[in-house]
A protein has these predicted regions:
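A residue-level marker of the well-folded mature domains of exported/periplasmic proteins
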Residues: 3, 25-347
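Bacterial N-terminal signal peptides
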Residues: 10-20
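Bacterial N-terminal signal peptides that target proteins for export
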Residues: 1-11
Length: 347
């Protein structure tokens, strides 16, 4: 595990927080306290530090925060546990009103999240189970996403196919999605030949190297389940380099404009994915923590429903971007999760 020296960390945090604009001084008309007066501060702390999904998530966070007139801070731990804890502590020290924790490891975050609660700060978590009744969990039904895409894999390839999965244990969404893969393996007689994966700053490149070795050693693999978009990118890169796109197919989770472009390339191996709109997830996270700040607890679980998107769907509908997808698939436009009459829509 890498460690960040205090001077470098301080500089990084200062730069991150300097990006934030002023909160809306006049407040929101008709909103409950403290939003009626303005000056509300929210911090969104992400475990990841790169990728199309994170970019879209943060865009959604910013869009909804702007609509609420919130002073927002965005920070990324770049896959480092210590840095994520430090960023949350920094948010506590700044006396923000709410913290959004985006991904991470539960065993690393439970105590620091409780520390925020003890300081009177509202906390919501996305894709990391902090097992705390006071912390709403923003969830995109990981099990449903995995089931949707694996049902498509069985439909396309039939029962009993030989496959592999890219998976790293200890991340709640990956754990839940991989559990469904194991469920399907038992139910449909799927043969799991290999499991591989890594979470670092260069996921696609690292996974590509691993995948090439796996596919060379296991030429009978016909399907690769990728429970994260960055994994899928790496697997596709490996398949393309090995020239086996007609033989090995990818069934994944998550979607972005870059993913759509990869799925619609000629002879692409990426056949289907199941996802929610990352930008909508970001909007919901801000609404959920805002409700908590206003004393309107959004519930222990705030659920977003996923949608299956196949390569055929994209090609037939001439979909090239997330914006195109939103026009064709209404589920990608918005969510009614964690809403209230006083919360304006993000623009």
């Amino acid at each position: 595990m890498k460690h960040v020296t205090r001077p470098l960390f301080a500089a990084a945090v200062a730069a991150t927080f300097a990006l934030c604009g002023p909160a809306q001084a006049q407040g929101l008309k008709g909103a409950p306290a403290p939003f009626d007066k303005g000056g509300v501060k929210i911090a969104a702390v992400s475990f990841l530090g790169a990728g199309d999904w994170l970019q879209a998530f943060e865009a959604g966070v910013k869009r909804q925060a702007d609509a609420l007139g919130v002073k927002l801070t965005l920070s990324q731990a770049r896959n480092d546990n210590d840095t994520q804890r430090n960023l949350i502590q920094q948010a506590i020290n700044l006396r923000v009103d709410g913290i959004i924790i985006n991904n991470g490891r539960p065993e690393v975050l439970k105590d620091i999240a409780q520390k925020a609660l003890d300081a009177g700060i509202k906390v919501v978590a996305y894709d990391v189970n902090l097992d705390n009744p006071k912390i709403p969990q923003i969830e995109q039904s990981d099990a449903d996403m995995a089931r949707l895409v694996l049902e498509q894999a069985v439909k396309d390839k039939g029962k009993g196919f030989t496959g592999g999965a890219v998976y790293v244990a200890g991340f709640a969404p990956l754990d839940r999605r991989y559990a469904v893969w194991k469920e399907f393996a038992g139910k449909y007689g799927l043969k799991e030949k290999a499991v591989w994966g890594v979470v670092n700053d260069t996921v696609p490149a690292s996974v590509a190297d691993q995948t090439k070795a796996v596919l060379r050693a296991n030429p009978d693999i016909a399907v690769v389940f990728t429970p994260w978009g960055e994994f899928a990118k790496g697997v596709k890169l490996a398949i393309d380099e090995l020239g086996v796109s007609k033989k090995v197919k990818i069934y994944g989770v998550d979607i972005s404009t870059a993913d759509i472009q990869l799925m619609t390339e000629p002879d692409s191996a990426w056949m289907a994915t199941a996802a929610t709109n990352a930008a909508v997830v970001g909007e919901v996270a801000v609404r959920a923590v805002s409700l908590a700040i206003a004393g309107q607890f959004p519930g222990r679980s705030v659920m977003l429903k996923p949608t299956l998107v196949t390569r055929d769907d994209l090609l037939k509908n001439k979909i090239a971007t997330i914006e195109d997808l939103q026009k064709k698939f209404s589920a990608f436009q918005k969510s009614d999760a964690a809403t209230a009459a006083w919360i304006p829509a993000g623009k």
